């Protein structure tokens, strides 16, 4: 009798949970339609892989790219709709979240064609690679719209788990295994630190998990200036710092960049920063509204350390990927300036604008590195000497992307940094802006050093890798070159589209 009662209660409880989930999906599912497209794409990939042979490989790329493009289209159609909170407060859709989701989808869309030839040459498993990329993209999109502490913790873990698997995808490479181990251990430690900070925030607010309700809870409990909030701020800053990889939370970055497959590095170098920046902006701006002076100070220290250490250490690197790793640490210092400036002086708009340009500059650079690596098998900066004599198109493309990363006019990086530094100057962050200007000059030095090597014509400086370089045709159907051309154009012709981009970024502010 007791067993029958327990069984009936279990069935009733299960039915209630199922009906509630069905109700949420039915009424709130339209608000995550772009994410649903990616989920449908993932299911299709699994079905095709389990029922087909090697001849259907092009279909896998087609489905992945199509699902990403359709997801971008769905986001664009939803633009300017009223902000909505769905799934019992777990998820929020507004223009601010959607523009970061757009940036993540754009990164993934450009990274897939960048990976095609690399996967074929290295004979890596294709389906799993695409599954991990799409799942990581999905996690990043949910993180951008996360509205409570649980979702903010679970979504980046979805992204991180796929990142660990992607970084160790070349299992036979010792460097890849070492990078994955460091990435996994430090990622696990940072996640535990982050959730510990969330526990302090949860307790101080009286048991609230939604971001806006946490603010109301802190007011009701009069805990908004308590030591517990300061402890929460420190732990959460450290936890988010791992995702953003500013100094001194950058130790994993150079090793992971060097040991991971180059297309994976290209993907992680932009998507992780975009998703973490969106999350950091909302966390600092909403729950820590009453502690703005404290988190401003913390982020200023991180920005200064990142800009100085990242750019100075990049000078000494001999590997292109390690150089770009330290360069990305310096770049995140510039992005943090936009987070500190905030909404009042177009700080968020300048951050979004700079991130859009950073995506094109960084992915364009990595596309050149992937192409050069496949044709020569080397990543050493010294081995790029004389590339212009063998492949002028690739050398010029790499030079333009590097100059744009350095911020030389009239390239995209110059306009992005100009807008970002101008907003910082208007907000009174004079010291930060001066540090940013000085470190930008330092970055131009090591970028120009590489460009000088590219353009050299001295036979004694040209390495055997370039002497034996296989010249590519002027017009090629190579998917890597397609991504490279798109990124180079976006990095070099910003003047026509600068004002509309700024207007869209300003319109996205919450």
From Swiss-Prot:
GO terms for cellular component: chloroplast thylakoid membrane. One of its GO terms (biological process) is photosynthesis, light reaction. It catalyses: a plastoquinone + NADH + (n+1) H(+)(in) = a plastoquinol + NAD(+) + n H(+)(out); a plastoquinone + NADPH + (n+1) H(+)(in) = a plastoquinol + NADP(+) + n H(+)(out). The keyword Transmembrane applies. It is a multi-pass membrane protein. NDH is composed of at least 16 different subunits, 5 of which are encoded in the nucleus. This is NAD(P)H-quinone oxidoreductase subunit 2 A, chloroplastic. It comes from Solanum tuberosum.
């Amino acid at each position: 009798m007791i067993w029958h009662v327990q069984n009936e209660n279990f069935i009733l409880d299960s039915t209630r949970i199922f009906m509630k989930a069905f109700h949420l999906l039915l009424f709130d599912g339209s608000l995550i339609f772009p994410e649903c497209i990616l989920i449908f794409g993932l299911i299709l990939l699994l079905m095709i892989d389990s029922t087909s042979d090697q001849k259907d490989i092009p279909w896998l790329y087609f489905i992945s790219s199509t699902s990403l493009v359709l997801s971008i289209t769905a986001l664009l159609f939803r633009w300017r709709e009223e902000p909505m909170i769905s799934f019992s407060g777990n998820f929020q859709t507004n223009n601010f979240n959607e523009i970061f989701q757009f940036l993540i989808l754009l990164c993934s869309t450009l990274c897939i064609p960048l990976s095609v030839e690399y996967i074929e040459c290295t004979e890596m498993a294709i389906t799993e690679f695409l599954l991990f990329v799409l799942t990581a993209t999905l996690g990043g999109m949910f993180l951008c719209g996360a509205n409570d502490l649980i979702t903010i913790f679970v979504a980046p873990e979805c992204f991180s788990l796929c990142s660990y698997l992607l970084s160790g995808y070349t299992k036979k490479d010792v460097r890849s295994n070492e990078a994955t181990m460091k990435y996994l251990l430090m990622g696990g430690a940072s996640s535990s630190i982050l959730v510990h900070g969330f526990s302090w925030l949860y307790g101080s607010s009286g048991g609230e998990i939604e971001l806006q309700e946490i603010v109301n809870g802190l007011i009701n409990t009069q805990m908004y200036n308590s030591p517990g909030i300061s402890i929460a701020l420190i732990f959460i800053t450290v936890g988010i710092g791992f995702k953003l990889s500013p100094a001194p939370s950058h130790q994993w970055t150079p090793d992971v960049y060097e040991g991971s497959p180059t297309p994976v590095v290209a993907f992680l170098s932009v998507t992780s920063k975009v998703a973490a920046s969106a999350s950091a902006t909302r966390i600092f701006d909403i729950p820590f509204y009453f502690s703005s002076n404290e988190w401003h100070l913390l982020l200023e220290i991180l920005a200064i350390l990142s800009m100085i250490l990242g750019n100075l250490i990049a000078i000494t690197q001999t590997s292109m990927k390690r150089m770009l790793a330290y360069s990305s640490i310096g770049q995140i210092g510039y992005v943090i300036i936009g987070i500190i400036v905030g909404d009042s002086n177009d700080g968020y708009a300048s951050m979004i604008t700079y991130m859009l340009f950073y995506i094109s500059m960084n992915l364009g650079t990595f596309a050149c590195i992937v192409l050069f690596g496949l044709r020569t098998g080397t990543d050493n900066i010294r081995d790029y000497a004389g590339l212009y004599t063998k492949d002028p198109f690739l050398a010029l493309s790499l030079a333009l992307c590097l100059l744009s990363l350095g911020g030389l006019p009239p390239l995209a990086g110059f306009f992005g940094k100009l807008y970002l530094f101008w907003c910082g100057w208007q907000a009174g962050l004079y010291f930060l802006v001066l540090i940013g200007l000085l470190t930008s000059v330092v970055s131009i030095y090591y970028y120009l050093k590489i460009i000088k090597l590219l353009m050299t014509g001295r036979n004694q400086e040209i390495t055997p890798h370039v002497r034996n370089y296989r010249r590519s045709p002027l017009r090629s159907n190579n998917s890597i070159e397609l991504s490279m051309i798109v990124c180079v154009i976006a990095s070099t012709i910003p003047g026509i589209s600068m004002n509309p981009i700024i207007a869209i970024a300003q319109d996205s502010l919450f």
